[in-house]
A protein has these predicted regions:
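Cytosolic catalytic headpiece
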Residues: 364-583, 587-593, 626-629, 688-700
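Membrane-embedded alpha-helical bundles of multi-pass transporters
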Residues: 69-74, 99-100, 105, 117, ...
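Flexible metal-binding regulatory segments at protein termini and peripheral loops
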Residues: 1-78, 158, 171-174, 221-223, ...
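Juxtamembrane coupling segments of multi-pass membrane pumps/enzymes
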Residues: 18, 110, 135-193, 221-231, ...
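Conserved cytosolic catalytic loops of P-type ATPases
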Residues: 158-267, 365-409, 454
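Juxtamembrane helix-loop transition segments at the membrane interface in multi-pass membrane proteins
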Residues: 101-109, 144-162, 345-364, 679-694
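Transmembrane helix-loop-helix hairpins at the membrane interface
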Residues: 42-166, 293, 394
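Helix-interface capping motifs at the ends of transmembrane segments in multi-pass membrane proteins
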Residues: 62-90, 102-111, 116-131, 296-334, ...
């Protein structure tokens, strides 16, 4: 488990705020939340369902309008208007009073309660109409705010509907449809063409492609094939190859697949993703911690100021009623509701948008930190490179053809399970197409050096330079091998009887997208990018040169990677570590933000990383950083708007320039503006290009 890193950050256990229900206390089979509670801890429902607060507000407005209109009707008793205003008070203040009582009983304080106090104060002064107007505008603003916030929340809740409610399971030789909650480990389920996959599992029968975009964000369907051993128990398998594994909520292609269930519905990747996204909403960012601290001192100061203003009549020649009215207007103006919602609304929208793009951001802290990065450290293998060796060069010697060289090499290496041998066979067959391969005999491995065998009655040796150190390898061949190794290749010589017939080179090649991704990151304002690897320095520098990364550090053990990240952190302050989330976990823990790639298939990566790129897609990184920088900018805008409105309204109400009506309109207006501003994050585009340095926009 990771612990806090900077800025008083909270542990990665994602605790839920005291006094509020967990957003995922009752997450069902696919993570459905029975009660999703917003940051303030309130979700309103009642006799009119989810629209109850809005309908109550409209009833309040109707009663207010009727009371105000009837007050101008000649001969109409004042009691009629008063009764209508009281009705307006009841419906306009119902939810505010309910929330305040619940919060106070838990030992907390509800800022919105200040509005209720102001309305009661207006009633005491006999200004029933203004008090009712205050409650109407306030309740209407709240209802619209909840509606707007629900749009962001629905983006998260949409994830819960990805997995189908039922599955077609094979039991006792026949197919039967059951609820996914009833699936057990080892069940065999049938996935029909173009249907959603109901559970995480491995393919037992059938070949086809699966659209994994809902989980990983991959735009191209992924080919699937059956596992080699269908009887094996894969439930505890840590590393299952992508071509064998399927996820709940993804969409099958045109083929019928039979899948063995390896995770119960409640533990599926989509279910855990929804839980983590819901919990992430509760994580407070540095800005939110600041606003909370600000409110802690600001609210008491406002209450003291309001109390003092009530006695202004002792100093100024005015009646008590006017002083009290001014104090209530200041109370309305100074209530920091917009400030309270400014950061949570942006965090919710940012986390929801990221989840739709296949990126899990675990709360406000990593969201903001990601937008402030100055440097990124990358693990090489599997992050900047493909993670597996590929046949890169086939160099025939002494008059032999490339085809004949490959036939001999494949014949020998296809009997080995060594990763380099597998790469030679795969790459060679791709080059040869359908040519038949002879059988090798007398195959014998030479540990650490190579392999020997017979093909067509001739003795074949394939291996590194050490295998041939006694053979007086010609100088020109040695030079070719050394040139390849300087370029980061692993080279092997092929000898047939007494003649060297070729050189084969292999390399963990850079990802095709790596170079462009690094350029995008540089355009986003990442000042320094380094590559960390356990490979030798020569290989590290060769890969770095190909992808355009300036700093490469090789020959690193896991503890050396930790030291490298710590050193980078001291010089650049805000550093991310990008890796697989497993082997790189120690280095990630020491970085400002730990980012794991390909996390959909790794439980460990989902738990250890601050940010998880669900698909094995490096191009998701610029999207996540661009989104985070956009979110950081919106949070700053919201702070200026919310604090600016308060800063303007307080002196205006103290001087009597603005009354309660305009004050509450400005107050509620600013709240809706910051929420609407935050919702812009939901429309953030994957390919949205931004040149931003340190979180500030610059002209492209």
């Amino acid at each position: 488990m990771k612990t806090d890193k900077k800025n008083g950050n909270q542990p990665k256990t994602l605790p839920v705020k005291n006094g509020a229900k967990s957003a995922s206390t009752k997450v069902g089979a696919v993570g459905k939340s029975d009660s999703h509670v917003e940051e303030k801890g309130h979700e309103h429902s009642g006799v009119f369902g989810k629209n109850t607060e809005l309908i109550f507000s409209l009833i309040c407005g109707t009663a207010l309008g009727a009371g105000f209109g009837l007050s101008y009707v000649a001969g109409m008793p004042e009691l009629v208007s008063l009764i209508l205003y009281i009705i307006a008070y009841f419906f306009g203040g119902f939810f505010t009073a309910k929330e305040a009582i619940q919060t106070i009983m838990k030992g907390g304080f509800e800022i919105d309660f200040l509005m209720l106090v102001a309305a009661i104060g207006a009633a005491i002064l006999g200004s029933w109409m203004e008090g009712a107007l205050l409650l109407f505008l306030f309740s209407l603003g709240h209802a619209l705010e909840h509606y707007a916030m629900s749009k962001a929340r629905k983006s998260i809740e949409a994830l819960t509907s990805l997995a189908p409610p039922t599955a077609l399971v094979v039991r006792d030789g026949s197919q039967q449809e059951i609820r996914i909650e009833e699936l057990v480990l080892g069940d065999l389920i049938v996935i029909k063409p173009n249907s959603k996959i109901p559970a995480d599992g491995v393919v037992i029968k059938g070949e086809g492609s699966v659209n994994q975009a809902p989980i990983t964000g991959e735009s191209v369907p992924v080919d699937k094939s059956p596992v080699p051993d269908p009887n094996k128990d894969y439930t505890n398998e840590k590393s299952i190859k992508p071509q064998y594994r399927v996820f709940a909520g993804t969409i099958n292609g045109a083929a019928v697949l039979e899948v063995k269930v390896i995770k119960e519905a409640k533990d599926s990747t989509i279910s855990r993703l929804v839980k983590m996204v819901n919990e992430a909403e509760k994580q407070k960012s540095p800005t939110q911690l600041f606003t909370d601290k600000f409110e802690k001192y600001f609210v008491p100061v406002v209450l003291v100021l309001v109390a003092a203003l009530c006695f202004a009549f002792l100093v100024i020649d005015e009646p008590f009623s006017k002083s009290f009215y001014r104090a209530m207007a200041v109370l309305v103006a100074a209530s920091p509701c917009a400030l309270a919602i400014s950061t949570p609304s942006a965090v919710l929208s940012g986390v929801a948008r990221a989840a739709r793009g296949g990126v899990l951001i675990k709360g406000g802290r990593p969201l903001e930190d990601l937008g402030s990065l100055n440097a990124i450290a990358f693990d090489k293998t599997g992050t900047l490179t493909e993670g597996k060796p590929q046949l890169t060069n086939v160099i025939p010697l002494n008059g032999i053809s490339e085809e004949d060289l490959l036939v001999v090499a494949i014949a020998v290496e296809k009997l080995s399970d060594h990763p380099l041998a597998e790469a030679i066979v795969k790459g060679g067959l791709e080059k040869l197409k359908k040519q038949s391969i002879p059988e090798a005999s007398k195959v014998k491995g030479i540990t650490g050096r190579g392999v020997q065998a017979e093909v067509g009655g001739k003795k074949i040796l394939i291996g590194n330079k050490a295998l041939f150190e006694k053979d007086n390898v010609p100088a020109e061949i040695i030079k070719q091998v050394e040139d390849l190794e300087k370029g980061g290749h692993t080279s092997m010589l092929v000898k047939q009887d007494k003649d060297f017939i070729g050189i084969l080179s292999l390399m963990d090649v850079p990802r095709k997208e790596a170079k462009n991704v690094l350029k995008e990151l540089s355009a986003l304002g990442i000042k320094k990018m380094i590559m960390l690897t356990g490979d030798n320095q020569q290989v590290a520098e060769a890969v770095a040169k190909q992808i355009g990364i300036t700093d490469a550090m090789g020959n690193l053990m896991p503890e050396d990677k930790v030291k490298a990240v710590q050193k980078l952190d001291k010089s650049e302050k805000m550093v991310a570590m990008v890796g697989d989330g497993v082997n790189d976990a120690p280095a990630m823990a020491k970085s400002t933000v730990g980012i794991a790639m390909g996390a959909a298939g790794s439980d460990v990566a989902l738990e250890t990383a601050d940010i998880a790129l669900m698909g094995d897609k490096l191009e998701s990184l610029p999207f996540a950083i661009g989104l985070s920088r956009k979110a950081k900018g919106i949070i700053k805008q919201n702070l200026w708007i919310s604090l600016g409105v308060v800063a303007v309204l307080i002196p205006l109400t103290i001087l009597g320039v603005t009354s309660i009506g305009p004050a509450v309109m400005a107050h509620e207006g600013s709240t809706l503006v910051v929420v609407g501003n935050a919702l812009r994050l939901l429309a953030y585009k994957n390919n949205q290009k931004q040149t931003i340095k340190s979180g500030r926009k610059k002209k492209a």
